[in-house]
A protein has these predicted regions:
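N-terminal glycine-rich phosphate-binding loop and ensuing alpha1 helix
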Residues: 2-50
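Active-site donor-binding loop signature of nucleotide-sugar glycosyltransferases
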Residues: 27, 69-71, 100, 147, ...
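Short phosphate-binding loop-to-helix
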Residues: 47, 53-115
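Nucleotide phosphate-binding site architecture
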Residues: 23, 56, 189
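Hydrophobic/aromatic residues located in beta-strands of well-ordered beta-sheets
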Residues: 6, 46-48, 95, 125, ...
Length: 192
């Protein structure tokens, strides 16, 4: 697939788990695992967007591309937009915001999301999976998404709402939101 870029926003100063990108998983930093997942999708250029020189140097030392961004961004999508707006020579058709804490994601789902975006002319897309157990259902660190229809076998639905905590039992149309977003370039400009 051409004309797609995957941008991974990553920073050391996270509130819930400081230095998370540098945490070791099997003797390798989490951000390197995430970068490898993105590369293994084989859909386009991969760039890590970070305000931290330590992350930049780690990515570059491992033959990846990283750029320094402003350290004042409120969200990862703001960081992604800075790279899109100021650091790319040509503007890709699809921008994938792949969260820097997803080292176990199957690279094929990134490819599936990009293919769906192109085939269905979507402006914005994201992924969801089944909520596996009661603990995940109650965990405020697990973002849930409520959709307008049952999603099975790579089907797609419209997101109705996103939330972390619910005071009532979850609807059967509530799923575990996966932290990856795809935008057309026009949608990213409108969103940010």
């Amino acid at each position: 697939m051409n004309n797609i870029v995957i941008i991974i926003p990553s920073r050391l100063n996270a509130e819930r788990l400081p230095n998370k990108p540098l945490k070791l998983i099997n003797n390798k930093e989490m951000i390197l695992h995430v970068h490898d997942v993105a590369k293994d999708s084989n859909i386009g250029q991969v760039i890590v967007a970070t305000p931290d020189r330590e992350i930049l140097e780690l990515i570059e030392k491992n033959n990846g591309k990283a750029v320094i961004t402003n350290n004042k961004h409120e969200t990862g999508t703001d960081r992604v937009f800075e790279v899109f707006e100021k650091k790319l020579n040509s503007k890709p058709e699809i921008i994938i915001n792949f969260q820097g804490d997803m080292p176990n994601l199957n690279p094929n789902v990134i490819k599936d999301l990009a293919e769906h975006m192109k085939k269905n002319l979507c402006d914005v897309g994201t992924l969801a999976s089944h909520i596996e157990n009661h603990h995940e259902e109650k965990d405020p660190n697990v973002v849930k998404v409520l959709v307008d229809k049952n999603i099975e076998n790579k089907s797609f639905a419209r997101a109705v709402d996103f939330f972390r905590i619910s005071n009532k039992p979850l609807d059967k149309l509530a799923y575990h939101h996966v932290g990856i977003y795809a935008f057309t370039n026009k949608a990213l400009i409108r969103y940010v």
